[in-house]
């Protein structure tokens, strides 16, 4: 098996009306936990790493782990650069073998965002690397970056249409009321806005900030064109809470083979749930389609 571009996964999802889950990874254990479930449920998967992830563990090491696990579990997977902000950073990582990148210029004015995204698209498309961009801006905390509610804004459908036409981007992350992190109250998802975006944009749409969003809301966004669902915070919390509980019950414990497995198993429960919600169960692509 191999590390592939997300475009093959998202094209199939768009055609068949499901979404591919994109799970954020941090180390060997999180990669293994996710792929154990994807193998079990025969689900396509995108493994996403933020710039902070690659500060913690080198890209070359993550790439080697993903490649090895892809072969071990017989799953083609996409290793995705999540929320990267510069062409230079993406260029280096794509040259190292990555075939999926998100360039996040959502903090820039429209024209600057377009210019940045177009430069990344031109570079990546020449190397069979798919590109995701974001228009509108989600609130919350992602990596080390915090966006307060006043700085967040929703995606305008007509701007989205123009943005896609000008950049040639492969998928578009839209701001429709979700936020990075957990919610203090039930999020207000603007389904009408999403439907209007779908009417004028024909590429796969991406839902960021899907942790803690009610399942029925996520399913509705998929019905309205979302083909990729990002999950990060729920995975970290499940892992951490399980490890904390294990140490509370085993105060003299010190063997990582035990407490890491407890964390992995808790994370696996979240992964199973998200695969079910996304409708990606038994949607694994054959290598000939990748």
UniProtKB/Swiss-Prot annotation:
Question: Zinc among the record's keywords?
Answer: yes
Q: What is its EC number?
A: 4.1.2.40
Q: What is the superkingdom listed in this entry's lineage?
A: Bacteria
**How, per the record, is the cofactor bound?**
Binds 1 zinc ion per subunit.
Cofactor(s), by name: Zn(2+)
Q: In which pathway does it act?
A: Carbohydrate metabolism; D-tagatose 6-phosphate degradation; D-glyceraldehyde 3-phosphate and glycerone phosphate from D-tagatose 6-phosphate: step 2/2
Q: Where is the active site?
A: 82
| Main EC class the enzyme belongs to | lyase
Q: Which GO terms describe its cellular component?
A: cytosol
Q: Where is dihydroxyacetone phosphate bound in this sequence?
A: 181, 209-211, 230-233
Catalytic activity field: D-tagatofuranose 1,6-bisphosphate = D-glyceraldehyde 3-phosphate + dihydroxyacetone phosphate
Please state which protein family the record places this protein in: Belongs to the class II fructose-bisphosphate aldolase family. TagBP aldolase KbaY subfamily.
State the protein's name: D-tagatose-1,6-bisphosphate aldolase subunit KbaY
């Amino acid at each position: 098996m191999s590390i592939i571009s997300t475009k093959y996964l998202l094209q199939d999802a768009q055609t068949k009306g499901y979404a591919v889950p994109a799970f954020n990874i941090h180390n060997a254990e999180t990669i293994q936990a996710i792929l154990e479930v994807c193998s079990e449920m025969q689900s396509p998967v995108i493994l996403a790493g933020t710039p902070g992830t690659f500060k913690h563990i080198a890209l070359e090491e993550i790439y080697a782990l993903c490649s090895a696990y892809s072969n071990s579990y017989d799953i083609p997977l996409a290793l995705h650069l999540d929320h990267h902000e510069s062409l230079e950073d993406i260029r280096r990582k794509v040259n190292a073998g990555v075939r999926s990148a998100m360039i996040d210029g959502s903090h820039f004015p429209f024209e600057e965002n377009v210019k940045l995204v177009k430069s990344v698209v031109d570079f990546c498309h020449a190397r069979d690397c798919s590109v995701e961009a974001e228009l509108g801006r989600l609130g919350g905390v992602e990596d080390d970056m915090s966006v307060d509610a006043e700085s967040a804004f929703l995606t305008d459908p007509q701007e989205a249409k123009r943005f896609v036409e000008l950049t040639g981007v492969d998928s578009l992350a839209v701001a429709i009321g979700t936020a990075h992190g957990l919610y203090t109250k039930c999020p207000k998802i603007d389904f009408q806005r999403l439907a209007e975006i779908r009417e004028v944009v024909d590429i796969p749409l991406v839902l960021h900030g899907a942790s803690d969003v009610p399942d029925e809301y996520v399913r509705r966004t998929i019905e309205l064109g979302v083909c990729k669902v990002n999950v990060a915070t729920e995975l970290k919390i499940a892992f951490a809470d399980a490890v904390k509980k294990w140490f509370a019950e085993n105060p003299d414990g010190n063997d990582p083979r035990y407490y890491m497995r407890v964390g992995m198993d808790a994370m696996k429960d979240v992964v199973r749930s998200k695969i079910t919600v996304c409708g990606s169960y038994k949607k694994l692509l054959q290598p000939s389609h990748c």
